[in-house]
Swiss-Prot record:
Gene Ontology BP annotations: inositol metabolic process; ribosome biogenesis; signal transduction; transcription antitermination
Annotated gene: suhB
CDD domains assigned to the protein according to its UniProt record, in alphabetical order: IMPase (cd01639)
Protein name: Nus factor SuhB
Organism: Buchnera aphidicola subsp. Baizongia pistaciae (strain Bp)
Subunit-level organization: Homodimer. The rRNA transcription and antitermination complex (rrnTAC) consists of RNA polymerase (RNAP), NusA, NusB, NusE (rpsJ), NusG, SubB, ribosomal protein S4, DNA and precursor rRNA; S4 is more flexible than other subunits.
SUPFAM superfamilies: Carbohydrate phosphatase
Length: 266
């Protein structure tokens, strides 16, 4: 096993155990909302400190960027850890058992290692660039679905993307016309992992946050999936819109989207 991957897995599992303990306490926490917010803030602080301490114990020269507190610890720009201590925070806050810990390791500006850990289901998704994606040690591949009809589609609403909202419901109607089943899970990292291992056929994300997506994107690519914007290009980081699926299904969807908007997408 890659030595950095081994440390990333240890970090994810350790924080997963902490999350479970807090989750059990949160289920019996009936305090007022403001006190609950303080409780969540404390959890994030504990998790991020644990992750940073564990990483720097093994790799003191590595840089770290955290999502929730936006901590940026720059020591070595060659290797950067992007850590999201709790992806699916709203689910956690409302006792919905669908959240995870997400880690991406960037080496010379390229994502080389990804770890996504779901402590509720004890599912560990790992990827190493050029070596594939795995779930609990078993190889993952995207589904080979080549039709939209009755497919299962993950969906992220474009709440911060007013430009895309003009297209959103039109595309949703297109999906409904093919009898697709939509799932809005509230956890983008697990959405990506689920496409990578075939639980979801396709993911339609109109609210891309690059720091949240780095780990999931490697899982997708290493399981044979494709990522594109609405035009079939790779401008999804600047546009904030991503389409994810296997190559056959992606071709079908992109053709239908082009027909729908008559090549007027910008």
């Amino acid at each position: 096993m890659h030595p950095i991957l081994n440390i990333a897995i240890r970090v994810a599992r350790k924080c997963g155990n902490i999350l479970i303990q807090y989750y059990d306490r949160n289920k019996t926490n009936n305090e007022k909302q403001i006190l609950k917010k303080d409780f969540i803030t404390k959890i994030i602080f504990v998790l991020e400190k644990t992750m940073i301490d564990m990483i720097h114990k093994s790799y003191p020269e590595h840089s770290i960027i955290t999502y929730h507190k936006n901590n940026k610890i720059f020591k070595n720009t060659e290797i950067i850890w992007l850590i999201n201590a709790l992806d699916g925070i709203k689910n956690f806050e409302n006792n919905l058992p669908h959240f995870c810990i997400s880690i991406a390791i960037i080496v010379r500006k390229t994502t080389q290692i990804s770890v996504i850990y779901d402590p509720i289901r004890n599912e560990l998704f790992t990827s190493v660039k050029g070596q594939g994606s795995q779930l609990n040690g078993y190889r993952m591949r995207c589904k080979s679905t080549n039709t939209l009809k009755r497919s299962l589609v993950g969906l992220v609403y474009p709440c911060n993307n007013s430009k895309f909202q003009n297209y959103f419901f039109t595309i949703i109607n297109l999906l409904f016309s093919h009898e697709v089943k939509l799932r809005c899970t509230g956890c983008i990292s697990l959405d990506c992992a689920y496409v990578a291992m075939g639980r979801l056929d396709y993911l339609f994300n109109g609210n891309l946050i690059p720091l949240l997506f780095s780990s999931g994107s490697l899982q997708i690519k290493e399981s044979g999936g494709l990522i594109s914007d609405l035009n079939g290009g790779h401008d999804y980081v600047s546009s904030g819109i991503i389409l994810i699926g296997n190559p056959k299904l992606m071709r079908v969807i992109l053709v239908k989207i082009r027909e729908l908007f008559q090549n007027n997408l910008k």
